[in-house]
C-alpha cells in the first residue's frame, strides 16, 4: 500500500536526520560475526555517555521530594562509589552489582558508578519477597547488592542462605538498621565532598 502523507513525512524526516554527515548518521558494522546497522556517532559506551553530562554540571539532575542534586553533585557521588566498588570489592568489567530499592537518587548513582566500571547492573524488582530476592541473587551472582531499608529487612532473614552460594557484600541506603558482617552503609563509604577527581580507569569495549 502507498504510504500516507504522515508516514511519508516521517520517512523523509528520518532520511534527513540520518543522512551522511548528520548527528544520527547510520553505518554498517559487524558485531561478533553479526552484521548490524548502528549510529555512527553514538558514544561508544555508557561511561562515555555519562561523561558527556559534565557540560551540565550546575544544572539540576535529580529532584527527589525536597532534595535536589545537580549533575556535578551526582557525578561526585558516582566517582566516590565507583572507586569504592573497585577498591573494596574488586568490581570491574564483567562483574555484576545488584540494586534493590525504591526510586531513591542512590539508584541512579549506583547505576552510573557500576556501568562506568564496565560492570553490569542487576535491577531487582522492589516488590520481591525474601525468597524471590534469594533466587534472584543466587541466579545473578553479583559481588555487591545495594539496598534500601525495606529491601534490607527482607534480605537479612535469607542472607546466610544466599552467602552459602554467593560471596555477597550488602550496602544499605537510608537505613539505620543493624548490619551483619560483610555489610556497609552508603553514608560511611560514599563521600561526595571528598571524591576523586576522575572515575577509575576501566577497559570497556562497546560490545560488552
Residue map of PLM features:
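Conserved AMP-binding/adenylate-forming core of the ANL superfamily
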Residues: 41-42, 58-112, 129-134, 138, ...
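Flexible, non-catalytic linker and terminal segments flanking ANL/adenylate-forming cores
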Residues: 1-43
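Conserved pre-ATP/AMP-binding loop-to-beta segment of ANL
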Residues: 184, 194-208
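Conserved helix-loop-beta element of the AMP-binding
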Residues: 141-143, 160-174
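Structured binding elements
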Residues: 118
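Conserved ATP-dependent adenylate/AMP-binding module captured primarily in the ANL superfamily
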Residues: 128-158
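AMP-dependent adenylate-forming
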Residues: 25-30, 47-70
Amino acid at each position: 500500500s502507498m504510504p500516507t502523507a504522515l508516514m511519508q513525512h516521517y520517512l523523509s524526516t528520518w532520511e534527513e536526520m540520518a543522512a551522511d554527515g548528520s548527528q544520527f548518521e547510520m553505518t554498517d558494522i559487524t558485531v561478533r560475526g553479526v552484521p548490524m546497522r548502528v549510529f555512527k556517532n553514538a558514544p561508544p559506551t555508557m561511561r562515555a555517555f555519562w561523561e558527556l553530562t559534565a557540560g551540565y554540571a550546575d544544572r539540576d539532575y535529580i529532584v527527589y521530594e525536597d532534595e535536589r542534586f545537580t549533575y556535578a553533585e551526582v557525578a561526585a557521588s558516582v566517582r566516590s562509589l565507583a572507586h569504592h566498588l573497585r577498591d573494596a570489592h574488586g568490581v570491574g568489567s564483567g562483574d555484576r552489582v545488584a540494586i534493590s530499592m525504591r526510586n531513591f537518587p542512590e539508584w541512579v548513582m549506583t547505576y552510573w558508578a557500576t556501568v562506568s566500571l564496565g560492570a553490569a547492573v542487576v535491577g531487582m524488582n522492589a516488590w520481591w519477597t525474601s525468597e524471590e530476592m534469594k533466587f534472584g541473587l543466587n541466579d545473578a551472582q553479583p559481588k555487591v547488592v545495594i539496598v534500601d531499608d525495606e529491601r534490607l529487612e527482607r534480605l537479612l532473614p535469607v542472607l546466610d542462605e544466599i552467602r552459602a552460594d554467593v560471596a555477597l557484600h550488602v550496602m544499605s541506603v537510608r537505613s539505620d538498621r543493624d548490619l551483619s558482617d560483610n555489610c556497609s552503609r552508603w553514608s560511611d563509604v560514599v563521600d561526595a565532598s571528598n571524591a576523586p577527581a576522575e572515575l577509575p580507569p576501566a577497559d570497556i569495549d562497546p560490545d560488552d
